[in-house]
Amino acid sequence: MIICALDFETTGLDKNNDRVIELGLSLYSTGHGRFLDSVGQLVKSDVKVTPKITRITGIRQEAIDAYGYEESSAISTLFEFVNQSSAVIGHNIRSFDWPFAEKWAKRMGVILPTVEVVDTFEDIPGVEPQKLVTMMAEAGLLLADAHSALADAQGSLRLARYHGIDAVVSRSRIPTVAVQSHAPRTSDNRDNKEAKFRWNPACKIWWRAVKETDVEELARSVPFSISVLDKSVSLESLRNS
């Protein structure tokens, strides 16, 4: 199986109005147990890098102006890698990078290939979702150059390899549901935050994506009641609002 590890650095979190400024891609063969090809590219865009994004990523506008690839070239590279793969993998890729890629492709007048999406934030068996650097550290793995797109892409693959890629891919195929928290509202909402629930301002709820098979275990582990949201409320709408 060929898997494409993928990560973006962007000008912000808005998939409609922000842009990819760095692309990290790495092809991995499960049969050979090694990376086959990798690329990291800065990407030019019509949205300027802010000081805040520079503080987070280390990427400066001057570097993009001098060394960045045009968007058309960068997205061609993305397609080249994804087209060789059966699946894409990344950390929080299901909520962020892949939807960002879909919006980017649509804006460029193309459609992304259909592949499986494996998310090391959600799909690692028996491990609580956390930041990539934290999950790697708990596995005894070093993430050098965090917030470098290529380092993060390869880091997600290394994390999956540590936990068993076959097990991670299998878990990625278990349906994911949206669970709502019914914790009493407090000034700091600590219970919700500690249990990894996220606030959705459009629906005005605290929610979390959970594997269908993990709902009962989550209900036992938190000090408040939860419920599975009706399927009319899509995960995509929750993630994108």
For each predicted feature, which ranges?
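Conserved beta-strand -> loop -> alpha-helix junction used to position metal-binding or nucleic-acid-contacting
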Residues: V110-I124
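Conserved non-catalytic scaffold segment of RNase H-like nuclease domains
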Residues: M1-T114, P129-A144
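Short, structured loop/turn "capping" segments at alpha-beta junctions
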Residues: L112-P113, L143-A146, D166-S172
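Acidic, divalent-metal-coordinating active-site segment for phosphoryl/phosphodiester hydrolysis
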Residues: S148-R161
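Acidic two-metal-ion nuclease catalytic site recognized across multiple nuclease folds
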Residues: L159-S241
